[in-house]
UniProtKB/Swiss-Prot annotation:
This is Elongation factor Ts. GO terms for cellular component: cytoplasm. Associates with the EF-Tu.GDP complex and induces the exchange of GDP to GTP. It remains bound to the aminoacyl-tRNA.EF-Tu.GTP complex up to the GTP hydrolysis stage on the ribosome. It comes from the Bacteria. Its main location: cytoplasm. It is found in: Cytoplasm. Keywords: Cytoplasm, Elongation factor, Protein biosynthesis. One of its GO terms (molecular function) is translation elongation factor activity. The keyword Cytoplasm applies. The gene is tsf. It comes from Helicobacter pylori (strain HPAG1). SUPFAM superfamilies: Elongation factor Ts (EF-Ts), dimerisation domain (SSF54713), UBA-like (SSF46934).
């Protein structure tokens, strides 16, 4: 420690946020050269970060920022290993700088972010330095950066626990309706945060996915019906289809004729068929689009009015406001979705760190 002053140690600590003993060791290793000591600590920090990187980061935050004019919005998922660190002021500052960098460089993917400059160095280098200082693996996992063309707005909602965030984009024609469209987008975002639709529209499903889900759905309903029969309760209809994408014009025409043939066989006069068939068709479509009702935003029943789907709510607003509204963007992030946290014995984890 000869020749290493307390002032030099303090200066290095102020520059790097590293621990006092680490700063002393670094200065001794490089004979008091401040720049080399900074490099030494950076290398040491990166080394620690690399060891931490094989630990699962499944806590953290979902953070979003909507522009005041509702013409753009950003959302990011940043993972940490523990909820405690996610509440750390240093972690909050990292989240803030991440959003600032995304905005400044028009970033749309994590790969772009890591290469982008922040304070004259790559963001990736800044991230590694924060991993070393905070002491946990930190991962910028997802980024959404939406920009609205003319006659579109974007609004969003982040749950107060910072574990769920949603962005919604809506197209409209009448500018005087913009404030109401902004509010509608936020309400729909709140719905999506709670109800977890996987996609915006059934058109986003593959036919293979729908067929697989329909088989599982039928098995589920048959099981429910066994219990309902035992209890003497009404049975649910067994669907033939699961999604609107399967209900082609030919399928609907065939079903309509089947209903008409049924009414004819019952001796119902043809002049009243038009009053009966539409209701039967509506029920047929409802029974055969259960996957849409569960997994699509437009097909779900609105939490604020459970007699209408989101699609119907948007259509009703269009009519009421003399406009032509359409949801064009839907992005939902849920913290740690798809990640499984490692269940490790704490003593074993400490032992691994000591290696």
């Amino acid at each position: 420690m000869s020749g290493i002053s307390a002032q030099l140690v303090k200066k290095l600590r102020d520059l790097t946020d590293a621990g006092m003993m680490d700063c002393k060791k670094a200065l001794v290793e490089v004979a008091g050269d401040l720049q080399k000591a900074i490099d030494f600590l950076r290398e040491k920090g990166l080394s620690k970060a690399a060891k931490k990187a094989d630990r699962i980061a499944a806590e953290g935050v979902i953070a979003l920022e909507v522009a005041p004019d509702f013409k753009s919005a950003m959302m990011v998922e940043i993972n940490s290993e523990t909820d405690f660190v996610a509440k750390n002021e240093g972690f909050k500052e990292l989240v803030k700088k991440t959003l600032e960098t995304i905005k400044a460089h028009n970033i749309h993917a994590t790969e772009e972010l890591l290469k982008s400059p922040l304070d004259n160095k790559p963001f990736e280098e800044y991230l590694h330095s924060q991993i070393a200082v905070i002491g946990e693996n930190i991962l910028v996992r997802k980024i959404a950066h939406l920009k609205a063309p003319s006659s579109h707005i974007i609004n969003g909602y982040a749950h107060s626990n910072a574990r769920v965030g949603v962005l919604i984009g809506i197209k409209y024609d009448n500018e005087k309706n913009a404030p109401k469209v902004v509010e509608l987008a936020r309400n729909i975002a709140m719905h999506a945060a709670a109800m977890k639709p996987q996609v915006l529209d059934c058109k986003d499903f593959s036919l293979d996915f729908v067929k697989k889900e329909t088989l599982a759905l039928i098995a589920e309903i048959e099981k429910d019906n066994e219990e309902a029969k035992r209890l003497g309760k009404p049975l649910k209809n067994i669907p033939t289809f699961g999604s609107r994408i399967e209900l082609s014009d030919e399928v609907l025409a065939h079903q309509k004729k089947a209903f008409e043939d049924e009414l004819k066989a019952q001796g119902k006069p043809e002049k009243i068929w038009d009053k009966i068939v539409p209701g039967k068709m509506e029920r047929f479509i409802a029974d055969n689009t259960l996957i849409d009702q569960r997994l699509t935003l437009l097909g779900q029943f609105y939490v604020m009015d459970d007699k209408k789907t989101i699609a119907q709510v948007v259509a009703d607003c269009s009519k009421e406001w003399d406009d032509d509204l359409k949801i064009t963007e839907y992005v939902r992030f849920e913290l740690g979705e798809g990640i499984e946290k490692k269940a490790e014995n704490f003593a074993e984890e400490v032992a691994l760190q000591m290696k």
